[in-house]
Amino acid sequence: SSAASDVYKRQGSYTGLRIGVSMAKGICYGRNVPLIGLPTLEVLSVPVLLYHDLPEDALLCPMLDARRMEVYAAVYDRALNVKRAIAADIVDENSYLEFLNEAPVYFYGNGAAKCREKITHPNAHFIDDIHPLAKMMYPLAEKAVAREDYKDVAYFEPFYLKEFVASLPKKSLLE
């Protein structure tokens, strides 16, 4: 049986995040087990760290597609220490230069593909086919359990990088 339930705590559709977090909270409450919240971009980094041979000074830049030329991205070192906190970035040829001028930067995730043509610095490296997988949560969840880094089941909420803005449909069903 599970000693804790873990859940992604960042980026995704608003409804999907709410449903997933509500389900995890219900399971934790009902089974009286702790809740662990894991940053999606860190989970996305686990297969890169496990299966790719990176230089010691490499920086990691996981990216999630946020539509148009925007991505949700953060920059980490190989120990997943935050070098730049998550932000919604509109990517252009000057994006991430402060990091690219200092070290090799590895871009991956479903937002990285659309950035390949824009980010052409010699220190920019792109890794294809990296997706957030539940099994990649385990190493991070294990560390959280060791630290007893549990979330309050009653008050935990997903991190919404942007505010939800509801809009009216352009066409009415009556038209």
Question: What are these language model-derived features?
Answer:
Residues 10-13, 17, 31-32, 60, ...:
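Glycine-rich, flexible loop/turn motifs
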Residues 12, 27, 107, 138, ...:
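A residue-level signal for conserved active-site and pocket-lining positions in enzyme catalytic cores
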Residues 83, 127-175:
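Acyltransferase
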Residues 19-23, 92, 133-137:
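Catalytic-loop motifs flanking and including active-site residues across diverse enzymes
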Residues 1-8:
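Short, small-residue-biased leader/transition segments that mark boundaries at the very start
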Residues 30, 47-51, 78, 140-147:
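Active-site catalytic microenvironments for nucleophilic, acid-base chemistry
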Residues 9-47, 51:
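Glycine/small-residue-rich loop that forms an oxyanion/phosphate-binding "nest" at active or ligand-binding sites
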Residues 34-132, 160, 165-166:
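Surface "functional belts" at beta-alpha junctions
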